[in-house]
């Protein structure tokens, strides 16, 4: 994909043109979750690391620049080759003189809170208006037992967060897993540089478990072992050093989901190369959900193929793959019967309240949606065109763009918000249908 910025990212609206079908191989950019994890691990390894097929998006660029402010590494980004080179400077980690601002990047902010515990001095970490509403309290409560003083500046459990660092000694702590698995991943990764063994006990059920599996897989690939008792306890032995070298990021399963959804609703065929049965990304399991809804699927070692068919509603617990709930929801809008998507309370505290956003925008398109605190019941029908509000949320924009491939008159407001995770989304969509029209 060209490194030249897509002018559609600057448009106020984007009108999606319909198409009748397609049979295409679509190459999806690297995983955002893995790129963030490799960046964090590499920055703590003390060795040069090259991250190939990295996702270069708003989130990962914010994270790269934030890591550099501690002074111990440089992160050289090559947009032409989708590569990030992380190189130690030989200097110790020190708190930056300026606040660290990460925009809407939730995973980087949560990783940085723990990382700042290794940096001498006081670090302030903050983000955009929505980020300043998102909960960090469970992580802030867990860090003092490991020697790190981390507090919400306004006392509300949300950013800005103040961290007094140089003190991440390790030891034992407990943390709730009910709000976000990113807190657990943050502690596990940053325990890599703790002075003693670090034991992390999960005090209740852990949501979004596959994301912790991705953290453990990334650490293992870079030579770090973590002892575990299921999802109840994780122990990171001290004295380990992550090895540098070269790592390759597999395609992003969340980004892939939009093209699987397109194949489903258009009774078309799509092949996604570079990702297969061995992936630790929980969002890969959307394939099984689409199969239950009537699609034909093939999951090989290095590719995934989905062919759409007559769609029917299903009942499904999506707790393990919350990021692809919007993708499933747009498919449900075209399915016969009702799709009941449950156990998705975590969507209330994403870039927007995604349960409310998906419900509102599907209703605009004439679809009956029953909204619950942690669920959506979507009764399929014949959606009509609508002007879609995107709530500064990349996943809402991409989801409803897929609906616009089948339904005439779908207009996406603020199409540039996709840059958070998939800046080449509109160009990738062109591989299915080249005729997209932007209006100013």
From Swiss-Prot:
<feature type="binding site">
    <location>
        <position position="181"/>
    </location>
    <ligand>
        <name>3-phosphoshikimate</name>
    </ligand>
</feature>
<feature type="binding site">
    <location>
        <position position="106"/>
    </location>
    <ligand>
        <name>phosphoenolpyruvate</name>
    </ligand>
</feature>
<keyword id="KW-0057">Aromatic amino acid biosynthesis</keyword>
<dbReference type="InterPro" id="IPR013792">
    <property type="entry name" value="RNA3'P_cycl/enolpyr_Trfase_a/b"/>
</dbReference>
<dbReference type="InterPro" id="IPR006264">
    <property type="entry name" value="EPSP_synthase"/>
</dbReference>
<comment type="function">
    <text>Catalyzes the transfer of the enolpyruvyl moiety of phosphoenolpyruvate (PEP) to the 5-hydroxyl of shikimate-3-phosphate (S3P) to produce enolpyruvyl shikimate-3-phosphate and inorganic phosphate.</text>
</comment>
<feature type="active site" description="Proton acceptor">
    <location>
        <position position="323"/>
    </location>
</feature>
<feature type="binding site">
    <location>
        <position position="182"/>
    </location>
    <ligand>
        <name>3-phosphoshikimate</name>
    </ligand>
</feature>
<dbReference type="GO" id="GO:0005737">
    <property type="term" value="C:cytoplasm"/>
</dbReference>
<feature type="binding site">
    <location>
        <position position="420"/>
    </location>
    <ligand>
        <name>phosphoenolpyruvate</name>
    </ligand>
</feature>
<feature type="binding site">
    <location>
        <position position="323"/>
    </location>
    <ligand>
        <name>3-phosphoshikimate</name>
    </ligand>
</feature>
<dbReference type="GO" id="GO:0009423">
    <property type="term" value="P:chorismate biosynthetic process"/>
</dbReference>
<feature type="binding site">
    <location>
        <position position="350"/>
    </location>
    <ligand>
        <name>3-phosphoshikimate</name>
    </ligand>
</feature>
<feature type="binding site">
    <location>
        <position position="180"/>
    </location>
    <ligand>
        <name>3-phosphoshikimate</name>
    </ligand>
</feature>
<feature type="binding site">
    <location>
        <position position="395"/>
    </location>
    <ligand>
        <name>phosphoenolpyruvate</name>
    </ligand>
</feature>
<comment type="pathway">
    <text>Metabolic intermediate biosynthesis; chorismate biosynthesis; chorismate from D-erythrose 4-phosphate and phosphoenolpyruvate: step 6/7.</text>
</comment>
<dbReference type="Pfam" id="PF00275">
    <property type="entry name" value="EPSP_synthase"/>
</dbReference>
<feature type="binding site">
    <location>
        <position position="208"/>
    </location>
    <ligand>
        <name>3-phosphoshikimate</name>
    </ligand>
</feature>
<dbReference type="InterPro" id="IPR001986">
    <property type="entry name" value="Enolpyruvate_Tfrase_dom"/>
</dbReference>
<keyword id="KW-0963">Cytoplasm</keyword>
<feature type="binding site">
    <location>
        <position position="32"/>
    </location>
    <ligand>
        <name>3-phosphoshikimate</name>
    </ligand>
</feature>
<comment type="similarity">
    <text>Belongs to the EPSP synthase family.</text>
</comment>
<feature type="binding site">
    <location>
        <position position="37"/>
    </location>
    <ligand>
        <name>3-phosphoshikimate</name>
    </ligand>
</feature>
<dbReference type="GO" id="GO:0008652">
    <property type="term" value="P:amino acid biosynthetic process"/>
</dbReference>
<comment type="subunit">
    <text>Monomer.</text>
</comment>
<feature type="binding site">
    <location>
        <position position="354"/>
    </location>
    <ligand>
        <name>phosphoenolpyruvate</name>
    </ligand>
</feature>
<dbReference type="GO" id="GO:0003866">
    <property type="term" value="F:3-phosphoshikimate 1-carboxyvinyltransferase activity"/>
</dbReference>
<keyword id="KW-0808">Transferase</keyword>
<dbReference type="InterPro" id="IPR036968">
    <property type="entry name" value="Enolpyruvate_Tfrase_sf"/>
</dbReference>
<dbReference type="InterPro" id="IPR023193">
    <property type="entry name" value="EPSP_synthase_CS"/>
</dbReference>
<feature type="binding site">
    <location>
        <position position="134"/>
    </location>
    <ligand>
        <name>phosphoenolpyruvate</name>
    </ligand>
</feature>
<feature type="binding site">
    <location>
        <position position="182"/>
    </location>
    <ligand>
        <name>phosphoenolpyruvate</name>
    </ligand>
</feature>
<dbReference type="GO" id="GO:0009073">
    <property type="term" value="P:aromatic amino acid family biosynthetic process"/>
</dbReference>
<keyword id="KW-0028">Amino-acid biosynthesis</keyword>
<feature type="binding site">
    <location>
        <position position="33"/>
    </location>
    <ligand>
        <name>3-phosphoshikimate</name>
    </ligand>
</feature>
<protein>
    <recommendedName>
        <fullName>3-phosphoshikimate 1-carboxyvinyltransferase 2</fullName>
        <ecNumber>2.5.1.19</ecNumber>
    </recommendedName>
</protein>
<feature type="binding site">
    <location>
        <position position="32"/>
    </location>
    <ligand>
        <name>phosphoenolpyruvate</name>
    </ligand>
</feature>
